[in-house]
Swiss-Prot record:
Organism: Erwinia tasmaniensis (strain DSM 17950 / CFBP 7177 / CIP 109463 / NCPPB 4357 / Et1/99)
Alphabetized InterPro entries for the sequence: Ribosomal_bS16 (IPR000307), Ribosomal_bS16_CS (IPR020592), Ribosomal_bS16_dom_sf (IPR023803)
Cystine connections: none
Protein's recorded name: Small ribosomal subunit protein bS16
SUPFAM superfamilies assigned to the protein according to its UniProt record, in alphabetical order: Ribosomal protein S16
GO MF annotation: an example: structural constituent of ribosome
Gene Ontology cellular-component terms listed: cytoplasm; small ribosomal subunit
Any Pfam family: Ribosomal_S16
A biological process term (GO) from this entry: translation
Transmembrane parts of this sequence: none
């Protein structure tokens, strides 16, 4: 099953997440189909905390992809800010 979820990157104690479309059987940071955004939970100042390609996310959901709980919350946050 195709899912849209977060893949953790960044350094120890400084997480940075890529929002990726992947097969649910792949490892958390493993192979992915497409990168559709990023989330920086510790962004400060002028740093961009969240960027999502909502058109591509809607495309994948239309193809049957499921959303993780956190990604679903981030999409709602992005739509509210837009």
């Amino acid at each position: 099953m195709v899912t849209i979820r977060l893949a953790r990157h960044g350094a120890k104690k400084r997480p940075f997440y890529q929002v990726v479309v992947t097969d649910s059987r792949n490892a958390r940071n493993g192979r992915f189909i497409e990168r559709v955004g990023f989330f920086n939970p510790i962004a400060s100042g002028q740093a961009e905390a969240l960027r999502l390609d909502l058109d591509r996310i809607e495309h994948w959901v239309g193809q049957g992809a499921t959303l993780s709980d956190r990604v679903n919350a981030l999409i709602k946050q992005a739509k509210k800010a837009a």
